[in-house]
Amino acid sequence: MARKKAEPKKTAKPNNNAYIEGAGLVADEKITMSLEKNYMPYAMSVLVSRAFPEIDGFKPSHRKLLYTMYKMGLLNGKLTKSANIVGATMRLNPHGDGAIYETMVRLSQGNEALLHPYVMSKGNFGKAYSRDMAYAASRYTEAKLMPICQELFGDIDKDTVDFVPNYDNTTTEPTLLPATYPSILVNANVGIGVSMASSVCPFNLSEVCETTIGLMKNPDFNALETLKGPDFPGGASLLYDEEELDKIYRTGKGSVKLRAKYQYDKESRCLEIVEIPATTTVEAIIEKIIALVKAGKIREVSYIRDETDINGLKIGIDIKKGVDPDKLMQKLYKLTPLQDSYSCNFYILVHGYPRIMGVYDIIKEWVAFRMDCVRRRTSFDLAKKKDKLHLLKGLGKILLDIDKA
């Protein structure tokens, strides 16, 4: 009798549909609760991690770059390739090389975006006042720290600020830089976060230091006596408004008006714009004037060209015969970005929280920060001296009784 073939065992099919409790259910929730739980943490993380400057005057991306350059020995050393700096900065800043290099460009001397640049540059770093003058790739340019950075890093190795681990716990980085002057007010700082934006205008370094000394000696000191107004790197004239400046100094909010500077070449009937507001670019001005000429709103201009070269910014405007250049400029100020407003919104991170502060409050916070740095430096130096004194006392005992030793 023939045997029956054994039937193959049926294997159970895997269940790919895993059960998730609560999946597919729609729960009602007040929008205020949802915003508090989801939106606010996201907004705060953007503000704290990249958008707003802190009391030392730097955003995290600026601080990571400058500290990396300091550790590379670029404060007193020779220029090195920008690509090398960008690669080293990635140990602290987990972003693409493009974003890091763009940060370096803005901090550089060649870009002319800052009143007191932090990076000495060699090569083409573009110009802040021109969209078309793009910066060269990082492999073609070189950089090192400017001498002013000595005031940022002079005490950093004396426990003046806290250090935290980097993103992968392989090294540490400072939470702040122990700047010996109020750098937050010396260079412009613009940051756009979520639902909030910061715009800190720059002031003259000497005037900021005089104002700080004045407020330290007398809390009722009038900042307008020494701090005459913002000082922008591109020049341009500041239309002085004492009431508006006083409002900015006390509240941190307001605006200042900037006006381009020009000179007139009578022989060639040419207006030469040599300084423009920091809020605009050469291309934006030329495009606006061309649009006004085409629209028939300006008939006095025969030709306009960009004459910017290695010697600096210049816009040439040829005018028709019999036109008064001063009257034409007044018209251009009114209709073009040759006169523009710089909005001030002094949002600064203090102990991890965004605060809007005027010049008085900013200097007060900076003085408190600097006093803490000096106190910590003094404690560090004292501990070192005590250790040395202990060794010297031991050495003294040995020398006084050398036979027993």
Regions found by a protein language model. Name each.
Residues 2-15, 22-26, 30, 190-192, ...:
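C-terminal interaction appendages of subunits in large macromolecular complexes
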